[in-house]
């Protein structure tokens, strides 16, 4: 059986008119950065890469050493390619401008360089999430406003999962496709064509320690799941929670389920916990392209109009029937 690499896959997408040459090359640069991040993640304590960096990110969260390293890898890899007008990182407050002596392109790249980094020191899977938007026409100098586009305007989205194997999951608006890093070849190999989220599920992912802070619709929904076979749902459900969005969403993508980080009293003033531009939008695009659904509980995530670069939102995504049920409970109040 012929092994198809990420490069070959993207060339075929370009030939079919689904991606532009610059978008293809941009995704390849991101993939090379992912390989470099994977090497650093795998070294861990051997290279003194565990623990905190002694700095805080824009959200006031303590940065891990690998947060800083992954962020720098992505910035440096993508600066010089000529495909980008600017970048935005979850770890950095301001828009990252392309150096003046490098060529500029027609795309904007947003990323969470190392999602789930609180798990690094205990050797649990972490990941990278990225999103690609078009740079609006008629603007000379990129600024924050250029990035404030609803998620439905994304031209590509993906994530890398650094686990027992390194996976790159990608959509360019033509389904969801998975690639596994062959470390001997040094290439991502096409291993998961047209991934789909099962419509029904018996698994859910939520941080149950926040139950007392949830809004009534979420409390009602989770209570029904916990009642299992003897409750209104008539079947047993299992709860899974990794505290790494990439790992939790990947499980939903591969075997079905629902992932929830809902609005609660702890994060109400912030508008939610997860970042719209760096986490919610790309994951929502991936899940919808795989046949699932993604909402805030009140609105389709991809229709949310961003007001600021580091905006937070509630996230409920996964198998369509479950997401629709939770959303209906929110409508009922």
UniProtKB/Swiss-Prot annotation:
GO terms for cellular component: cytosol. One of its GO terms (molecular function) is magnesium ion binding. Substrate binds at residues 115-118, 207, 273. InterPro entries: FBPase_C_dom, FBPase_class-1, FBPase_N, FBPtase. SUPFAM superfamilies: Carbohydrate phosphatase (SSF56655). Pathway: Carbohydrate biosynthesis; gluconeogenesis. Mg(2+) 2 binds at residues 112, 115, 279. One of its GO terms (biological process) is fructose 1,6-bisphosphate metabolic process. This is Fructose-1,6-bisphosphatase class 1.
